[in-house]
Amino acid sequence: MNLEELKKRQEKIRNFSIIAHIDHGKSTLADRILEKTETVSSREMQAQLLDSMDLERERGITIKLNAIELNYTAKDGETYIFHLIDTPGHVDFTYEVSRSLAACEGAILVVDAAQGIEAQTLANVYLALDNDLEIMPIINKIDLPAADPERVRTEIEDVIGLDASEAVLASAKAGIGIEEILEQIVEKVPAPTGDVTAPLKALIFDSVYDAYRGVILQVRVMDGVVKPGDKIQLMSNSKTFDVAEVGIFTPKAVGRDFLATGDVGYIAASIKTVQDTRVGDTVTLATNPAAEPLHGYKQMNPMVFAGLYPIESNKYNDLREALEKLQLNDASLQFEPETSQALGFGFRCGFLGLLHMDVIQERLEREFNIDLIMTAPSVIYKVNLTDGESMDVSNPSEFPDPTKIATIEEPYVKAQIMVPQEFVGAVMELAQRKRGDFVTMDYIDDNRVNVIYQIPLAEIVFDFFDKLKSSTRGYASFDYELSEYRPSKLVKMDILLNGDKVDALSFIVHKDFAYERGKLIVDKLKKIIPRQQFEVPIQAAIGHKIVARTDIKALRKNVLAKCYGGDVSRKRKLLEKQKAGKKRMKSIGSVEVPQEAFLSVLSMDEE
C-alpha cells in the first residue's frame, strides 16, 4: 500500500471499547456486533464468544481484555474497520480496563435500563474520561418488563454529566438497536490520530505465551508501520527481536502483511523469555527508533497479599513457571519466594483484590494442575519502630517484636457503596462493624443512595463483599480505592497448637476485637483439626499473653474392656499406664493441620 492509501485507510479506522457494570450486557452486545458485521459465521457463534477462558464463562464475568477487528459497511456505502476491545467490569480488574482504554479513541457505555447506573459504571467512566475518550451512552435491556429508559437517561445526565439525548435504546439479547449503535460508532468515534510516516511506536497492551512461537505481543500501533522481517526494539530494556509475523484477531489470529497507524493486532517475534516484555511498554524499530516511549500505564500496586504453597513440595518449580506465565498477561500479579515452617516452600503473592486472588488460584489449579494451600490474605502495614526506623510488612509472620513497635499504620480505602434506600441502614451497620468511618451520602434518584465510607482495607479484604451482598439481597454495588494510611491499635495474634506456633496461622487484628477473634478462631480450629491420640491444646496469644484456649480431647481406647469385675486397683493400674503412654506421645507428637484450618482464620465472622 502506498502512503495515500494508508492515510485513507487510517481515516476509516474506529477503535472503541465497551464499558459497563457486571451483568449489564456487555459481552452480549459484543456478540451481537460480531454477528451483525458477519465477523463470525453463525456456525462458530456461541454466547459470550470473547470470554474465552472457561473460568470467565462459568462465572459469567470478563477477566481478560480481548481485541477484535471487524469490517462494517456503513449506510454511506464506505467500509469501516472497527477494533472492538472488550474490557472487564469488575473492580479488581480496573487495571485491565485502563489498559484497554489506552488503546482506544472511543467507548460505548452500556447501562442497564432496569438497574441504572452502578458504582462500577462510574469508576470505568472516570477511567475513560482520564483517557480523553469519546463516550457514547447506550441504554440496554429495554425489552425487560422493569425497564425504565427515561429514568436511566436522566440518571446518566445527572450522575455522570454526559449528554444522553442521543443515547441508543437497545436490547443486545433481542438484537434491537444494534445497527444504530454501529452507525453512531462511525459518526462519533474519532479516527486514530497518528503519523504513518513517523518512526514506529506501538503500545503493548497485552501479551500471551505460545509454546511454539514464544511471547506474542498484542499492540495498538500509534505511529508508523510494522511488517514481518522488521527488527523491533522494546524501549524499556532496548532488547531487539526479528518480527516473524504480524496480524489481527477476528477472534482467531489471522496473519497480515503489515500493521499501520491505528491498527490493533499482534506481533510474533520469537521472544523467548517472559521477563523481556512488560505490558505498557513501547515497541519501535531498531533501525529507526522513536525518540521517546509512549507514556504507558501507571504501575498497579497490589493491595492484598497471601502465601501460595504447593501441596506436593516437589511442584515448587512448576508453581514458579506457572506464576511467570500468568504474570505475562496479568502485569498486576507480583510474587516472591518465601518459606514457612508449617507449609514448606512457596511464594508470597500480591493481588489487586479478592476476586483477582480467587481467579489466579483457580487458574493455577486448572490450567497448570497444581494443588495449592493459600494462607490468609493480608495488606501492607507500615510499622514504625521505637528507634525511629519504619518498615512495610505484608506478612504477619514477619512482624517485629511487639516491644520494638512504636505505632502501626494500616491502609484505609474510600469505599463507594450504591444501594437502594431501604438497605441504607443495613449497609451502615455493616460498615460500622468493619470499623468504617462515615464520610457522606448522596441521593442518585428517589430510591438509590450513594454512601461513602473510609474503611480499613484489612476489613474489606476477606468477606466484606459477600456480607454486603447478603445484607442488601444482592442490590448493592461497590467500588473502592486506596486513600491513606492511618495509625491504628493493631496487634499480631499467634495461634499455638500443642505449644508450638503455627506461622501460617498468624494474623493482624485490632486490639479491641482481639479477644473475641481469638476465641472464635480457637473454637473453630477445634472443630476442624481431627482428634489425635493425645490431648492438643489450641491457644491464641498476643506476644506472651494467652487470650483464649481450648483443648482437643484425646482419642482413647477403652483399656478396661477386658476386666470383667475384678479389683479396682487392677483397673487403676491399666488407666495409669494408658495415661503415661499418652503423655509420652504428647511430648513427641506433631499435629497435622488440614487446609480448611488456614481458610477458617479468614472467614471469621459471627458464625
Swiss-Prot record:
Highest rank taxon of the organism:
Bacteria
UniProtKB keywords: Cell membrane, GTP-binding, Hydrolase, Membrane, Nucleotide-binding, Protein biosynthesis
Q: Where is the tr-type G domain?
A: 11-193
Disulfide-bonded cysteines: none
The residues that hold GTP are: D23, H24, G25, K26, S27, T28, N140, K141, I142, D143
Which Gene3D superfamilies does the UniProt record give?
Answer: 3.30.70.240, Elongation factor 4, C-terminal domain, Elongation Factor G (Translational Gtpase), domain 3, P-loop containing nucleotide triphosphate hydrolases, Translation factors
- Top-level EC class: hydrolase
Task: Please name the gene that encodes this protein.
Answer: lepA
Entry similarity comment: Belongs to the TRAFAC class translation factor GTPase superfamily. Classic translation factor GTPase family. LepA subfamily.
According to its UniProt record, where is this protein located? Answer: Cell membrane
Protein source organism: Streptococcus pneumoniae serotype 19F (strain G54)
Enzyme Commission no: 3.6.5.n1
Keyword match GTP-binding? yes
- Please name the NCBIfam families in this protein's record: lepA (TIGR01393), small_GTP (TIGR00231)
GO terms under cellular component: plasma membrane
Q: Alphabetically, which GO biological process terms does the record hold?
A: positive regulation of translation
Primary residence: membrane
Q: Name one GO molecular function term.
A: translation elongation factor activity
**Functional note:** Required for accurate and efficient protein synthesis under certain stress conditions. May act as a fidelity factor of the translation reaction, by catalyzing a one-codon backward translocation of tRNAs on improperly translocated ribosomes. Back-translocation proceeds from a post-translocation (POST) complex to a pre-translocation (PRE) complex, thus giving elongation factor G a second chance to translocate the tRNAs correctly. Binds to ribosomes in a GTP-dependent manner.
Q: Which InterPro entries match?
A: EF-4, EFG_III/V, EFG_V-like, EFTu-like_2, G_TR_CS, LepA_C_sf, LepA_CTD, LepA_IV
Q: By what name is this protein known?
A: Elongation factor 4
- One short Pfam name that applies is GTP_EFTU
Its UniProt entry gives the catalysed reaction(s) as: GTP + H2O = GDP + phosphate + H(+)
User: How is this protein situated with respect to the membrane?
Assistant: Peripheral membrane protein
